[in-house]
Amino acid sequence: MDDVIIIGGGPAGLFASFYSGLRGMRVRIIDIQDKLGGKMHVYPEKIIWDIGGLAPKPCFEVIQDTVKQGLHFEPEVNLEERVIDIRKIEQQHFEVETDKGNVFSSKSVIIAIGGGIINPKQLDIKDAERYKLTNLHYVVQSLKKFKDKHVLISGAGNSALDWANDLSGYAKSVTLIYRKADIKGYEVMKEKLEQLNVKKLPNTHIHQLIGDETQTQIEQVILENIETGEHTVKSFDDVIISHGFDRENTLLEQSSAKVDMFNEYSIKGFGNTATSIDGLYACGDIIYHEAKAHLIASAFSDAANAANLAKLYIEPKAKAEGYVSSHNEIFKESNKVVMKKYL
């Protein structure tokens, strides 16, 4: 039996894993994705500024650091596995069931699933699916990939504007289309867009994708003006779709362990990450409490609190908090490795 099962492998779940390990608990992380890091993979090249004491760095480096830290105490990790039920059997005994038929037993559970499972909204037109592996994109993983390319972006939200702004410095041309007359992003982003060489086509959407001879890549796009019905054929090297995300929270809706909810996507909790069920805690964006700040930095605080409560739930006589890392003997050998860089 595990001491704690952490559902979710984003920044909150990873720090909960680290801190639970620091507190001597046996940990298992379960995540539906094929890699750890959570939603941070949506914006890997964005610069993260708001983690206290950490110099600005690209998100992919933050991912690397949080994953390395989260795995420091060698937790069990189950990837590409969806949790479909949480059951509280008795005091200090939970069962966590997954879509692979596994039923894991644990003394406590920490839910760290962010805003739930998110999936980019797909382009709903004929043959769109066949181009997903080539030049139809729903996430920008690397700006350099679009260097000297003619790029079409469909969308009017902040992500679409953000990508248009960033890609204008790499791509040969950027065309932004949106269905309404106006863009709905933040004013500062719209103002920045006006200063860049980005072609904007309002009242426009993608009518059809035209493939190359192999029918594996998009070669041209038929654009339709929604007001006039006029069609225009244009050539593009890459097409980016930014129509928002579909969110699902079926785990909390269908779980046998019914926690109190703040709204459809947030658990109602307390500043110490406790929920309405003893032994079940939540950290990161999935929990709402009065002191909540939706930052990666605050997810770390949530995670430490959740791990501390899990420890006290399992061992009521344990210390309320873990011993600080700077003076903790558990890091004695690891510190020697770290210090070699500075000697």
Curated annotation (Swiss-Prot):
One of its GO terms (molecular function) is ferredoxin-NADP+ reductase activity. InterPro entries: FAD/NAD-bd_sf, FAD/NAD-binding_dom, Fd--NADP_Rdtase_type_2, Ferredoxin-NADP_redctase_2. It is an enzyme of class 1 (oxidoreductase). Its cofactor is FAD. Coiled coil: none annotated. Its EC number is 1.18.1.2. Binds 1 FAD per subunit. Keywords: FAD, Flavoprotein, NADP, Oxidoreductase. Gene3D superfamilies: FAD/NAD(P)-binding domain (3.50.50.60). Homodimer. Belongs to the ferredoxin--NADP reductase type 2 family. This is Ferredoxin--NADP reductase.
